[in-house]
Amino acid sequence: MAGIRFFRMAEALARRGHEVDIVLNRHQEPQRLATRLREIPFKSVRWEHYHVVKTFFHRGFDSLVAEGGGDHPFIISKLGSVVGREQTEGVHFHGSVREQLYATQTAIAQRSRIVTVLTNRSAALWWKEHGVDSVLFQVPTGVDAEIPGAGANPYLRLGIEGPIALFAGNIYSRDKQAEVNLLWQDRLNRLGRSLKQRGISLVAMGAGETDQLDPAAVRHLGSFDASEYWDWQHHSQVGIVLAQGTAQDNESSKIYYYLRTGLPIVCEEPVPNKSLIEETGCGAIVPYDQIEAMSDAAAELVSARRDVDHIADYMIKKHSWDARAALYDPVLRGEGPMPAGLST
């Protein structure tokens, strides 16, 4: 769901009165998307016309440099992950992939006015690698304030009946994060078989390589547009969150999405933003790689009562994209530093 952030944050900043250009090579000419919001190709960009340039993850900064904008005086770099010079516990990028990310990160530290990260663990690693003089802020993932209501049950079209455990999100590719991809495919297979014994179907959706998934244990539906996604979640009974290992620096964006509809969650303990489940009382946190414990928790949550409206209101107020965009207002309006003290 990381790609959604790119557009949702831009939309939210525009709603807050900022003039925003999304720079992508999808169209030959600029496109007006909404009030104060355009999408333009790189050929139309004049970097010197912008007060601030905000990049999206390592690849966004690489694109900025490649397109001649790396010397802009006010770059805000958003990082989804922070890697170490050496392999670091909790960071699940390895070998040449990690080395390339670190090279980009070093350039970000040298050229960016502000860097934003997702979690406390990522902030600590950034300071360890790049020093405490970096202007660093924590801006977690957000979620849509407005979503479609429930439509027809899409699972029935596929002949899937009964309780659904949903795993929504990227399971990664072999060329970027092979270790997590293979680990998660194995664990989804094991979890699917265990859930099946309890009368629950495990359904997964999102990008990533799925060649090791057992279709008898896990039904993988591929990727969907954000507008299509919500019906699948509305008609699920529990959401699944896997950790990437016994330690994990990255948050899980799917937690924000599950909670937006009050979907109860079974989450593994190493996931940093598991505290949202505790705050909302909507789910269970289980030890890492305890498949039977996950299945037992899912079976209990399928029929658990919860205050869906209260949970949704909480997520909108505290964790919507507009709430996240508001954190940038002091900087973008020249009023001073961004608020500090965020925690996940």
Please give the residue ranges for each predicted region.
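A charged, aromatic-enriched C-terminal amphipathic alpha-helix characteristic of glycosyltransferases
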Residues: D289, A293, V302-P339
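Nucleotide-sugar-dependent
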Residues: M1-I4, D175-L182, S227-W232, G239-Y257, ...
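Helix-loop-beta element that forms the nucleotide-linked donor phosphate-binding surface
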Residues: Q110-R111, T116, A123-V143
